Each structure stands twice: as structure tokens, then as C-alpha cells.
């Protein structure tokens, strides 16, 4: 049996398929969710997310900008502000964002709300760059 995985962003449904396992990083660490998992509600960290579907040897790798996870016996719902498959990451754009944010943060005189917002943006960009440079092969659809 497989788990129905639904990933929703502000732009709509990002992913809605049956999967063998989805691996996420929660505040409590890495967890793998499969069909029959105990009910769970948790936050998801800015991290790498792995999806393994039947017929794929390798995991689909995603960059996720944090979110919420709600698991029932046969279904997992993830709500996130942003997620993208590894192969869809625009590396040049991410590098430009990284350089821009590093410059802004290094020139900040005080740690106000803008500083912390930019620091969070930088964590998200670093995650995208790390995932895009990861040598793990992810299958194309």
C-alpha cells in the first residue's frame, strides 16, 4: 500500500501522488512517513525533502522552505510557502540572491526586523544551493 502525499503552496498543489515514503526534517529530526504511519502534526524545517515513488530507483529531492506536516494513516499533507524539485532550482539566480543577502547582512548596523527577515531568506537560499550542488541523482519525470 502507498501513502497519498499532497504538498500545497500558496500557488496551489505542488505534488499530489501516491508514494512509498517521504522523508522530512522536523524540529525533532529526520522522519520517514509511509502508509500506516501513526497520526502526526509537526513543523518542517528549512531542509531537503525526499520523495520515493514506485518505479523510481532514486528519491526525488526537493528544497523546502519549512512548513507544516499533518499525517493520517493513509495520507500526508504538507503545507509550505515554497518548495521546488532539485532539478528546477535556478542556480545562478540563487547565487545572485546569496551574494546580495550576504552583502546586506554584512552592512547592517543593527539587528532589526529587516535583518532577521534577510537572515531567514539567506538560510533558504543556502538550502537551495546546497541541494542543487548535491551529487545525488534524482530522476526526471
From Swiss-Prot:
SUPFAM superfamilies: Epsilon subunit of F1F0-ATP synthase N-terminal domain (SSF51344)
Alphabetized GO MF terms: ATP binding; proton-transporting ATP synthase activity, rotational mechanism
UniProt keyword Membrane, yes or no: yes
UniProt keyword terms in alphabetical order: ATP synthesis, Cell membrane, CF(1), Hydrogen ion transport, Ion transport, Membrane, Transport
One term under GO cellular component: plasma membrane
Pfam families according to UniProt: ATP-synt_DE_N (PF02823)
Membrane topology designation: Peripheral membrane protein
Subunit structure, as described in the record: F-type ATPases have 2 components, CF(1) - the catalytic core - and CF(0) - the membrane proton channel. CF(1) has five subunits: alpha(3), beta(3), gamma(1), delta(1), epsilon(1). CF(0) has three main subunits: a, b and c.
Family recorded in the similarity comment: Belongs to the ATPase epsilon chain family.
Protein name: ATP synthase epsilon chain
Amino acid at each position: 500500500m502507498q501513502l497519498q502525499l499532497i504538498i500545497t503552496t500558496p500557488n496551489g498543489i505542488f505534488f499530489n501522488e501516491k508514494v512509498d515514503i517521504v522523508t522530512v526534517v522536523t524540529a525533532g529530526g529526520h522522519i520517514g512517513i509511509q502508509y500506516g504511519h501513526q497520526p502526526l502534526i509537526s513543523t518542517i524545517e528549512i531542509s531537503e525533502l525526499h520523495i520515493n515513488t514506485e518505479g523510481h530507483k532514486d528519491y526525488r529531492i526537493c528544497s523546502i522552505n519549512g512548513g507544516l506536516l499533518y499525517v493520517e494513516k493513509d495520507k500526508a499533507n504538507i503545507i509550505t510557502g515554497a518548495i521546488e524539485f532539485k532539478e528546477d532550482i535556478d542556480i545562478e539566480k540563487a547565487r545572485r540572491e546569496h551574494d546580495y543577502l550576504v552583502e546586506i547582512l554584512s552592512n547592517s548596523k543593527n539587528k532589526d526586523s529587516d535583518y532577521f527577515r534577510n537572515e531567514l531568506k539567506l538560510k533558504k537560499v543556502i538550502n537551495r544551493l546546497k541541494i542543487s550542488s548535491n551529487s545525488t541523482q534524482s530522476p526526471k519525470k
